[in-house]
Amino acid sequence: MSFGTRRGWAPRAFPVDRTAARRLQEWLQEGGGSLDAVGLDLRGADLTGGDFSESWFSDAKLAGVVLKEADFYRADMQGADLSGADLAGASLVRSNLDDSVMRAAVLDGADFVKASLYGVDASGASFRGARLMGASLLDANLCGADLTDATVMENSFRVRLDETVILQGFSGSIFGPVEVSTGEKLTTIGGADLEQWIRNKGGTVTVISRSQRADRH
């Protein structure tokens, strides 16, 4: 598999930070490949459609950055700040997003298959139509998130939700339980109770029990 920039691709806008802009320009001149953007401040950039497969964005500042339809296959984005970033239609297959911040990010139609999202804060994020099959969501905060028409399949889904989360059309199967926040109180819900709670919000999800999970391995 060949990684790097798509033929003729260029950022629609470069980062405001000079160091980050210079690094991005150097990467383009080098012909693409894996971009080392560890810790860089990429705010202000529009990187729509860029190919960042197997690149490094750990601890990078990507708040508000436009990343629509960008490819982050196997990218390391651990600890990155993606608050308010626009990743609509992006591919994050097998990416590492552990401990990243995605508060209020737009993730509509994004592909998270087999991605790792341990400890992610995605409160208020929009996952409308996102593909989350096989992704690991452990200790993730999805309070206030919009999961309309999002799809899961045998996902580790130990997450925190609240009454404002939108689950209309949310479908597939998960390994629970989840924590539901109601004010200052946290309630753990699993099994049939979790299925019913999701159903009451317009979703159709099967919660796989521990015994069923063991039978699958």
Language-model features, listed with the residues they occupy:
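Tandem repeat scaffolds
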Residues: 1-217
